[in-house]
């Protein structure tokens, strides 16, 4: 059985996170990913010091929001806790699952580790099933290169049916392409891709 909003648990969205938008038309972007993929480095690279930290409603789990802008859009980035799956088994995973499913984000960026990409694809595929506007950011391409691992970003994009961007988040300029794709998705210019559909046995 595939993931649906209803299958994630009744009442999961009872306590909503307050999103601090700089303007009414600012886009909300969830930053998701497995632990230790450089997700917070992407967050810090995009938002700099323009961020706010606190706790998720009813949780001791830390929450970080930050603002970044392009010439086309303003964004509120929400750095959600690292998780391997939307099937929650801890408070952190529950927070991540609930925000992806119920948080109303305009886009979800799933950050992946280029050195162990296969392990990251479970969360990517689950997120594609739930959300309409998903971007995959393959981070740590420099480390992958050192390990003689080559990631074919174009083929990955073709297979997944969603935009795929490569990055070395420690180098801020490499995040410009991610911002450009975020703008395109916000403007409805994501192309004519059809997101991958997972078939499950009866």
What are these regions (language model features)?
Residues 2-88, 103, 107:
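Conserved G1/Walker A P-loop phosphate-binding module
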Residues 49, 58, 82-83, 114-118, ...:
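Conserved nucleotide-binding/hydrolysis micro-motifs of P-loop NTPases
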Residues 57, 61, 76, 88, ...:
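Helical mechanochemical/support elements of P-loop NTPase systems and associated helical scaffolds
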Residues 66-72, 95-165:
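Conserved C-terminal guanine-recognition region of P-loop GTPase G domains, centered on the G4
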Residues 142-196:
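Canonical P-loop GTPase G-domain recognition
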């Amino acid at each position: 059985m595939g993931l649906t909003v209803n299958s994630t648990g009744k009442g999961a969205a009872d306590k909503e996170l307050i999103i601090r938008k700089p303007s009414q038309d600012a886009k909300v972007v969830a930053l998701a990913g497995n632990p230790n993929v450089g997700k917070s480095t992407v967050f810090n690279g995009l938002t700099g010091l323009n961020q706010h930290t606190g706790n998720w409603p009813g949780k001791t789990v830390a929450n970080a929001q930050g603002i970044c802008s392009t010439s086309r859009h303003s964004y509120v980035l929400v750095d959600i806790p690292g998780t391997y799956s939307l099937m929650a088994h801890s408070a952190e995973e529950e927070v991540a699952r609930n925000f992806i499913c119920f948080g109303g984000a305009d886009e979800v960026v799933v950050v992946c580790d280029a050195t162990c990409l296969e392990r990251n694809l479970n969360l990517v595929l689950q997120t594609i099933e739930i959300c309409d506007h998903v971007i995959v950011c393959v981070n740590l391409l420099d480390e992958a290169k050192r390990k003689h691992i080559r990631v074919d970003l174009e083929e990955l994009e073709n297979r997944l049916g969603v935009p795929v961007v490569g990055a070395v988040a420690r180098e801020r300029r490499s995040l410009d392409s991610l911002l450009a794709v975020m703008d395109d998705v916000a403007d409805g210019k994501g192309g004519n891709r059809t997101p991958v559909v997972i078939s499950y046995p009866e």
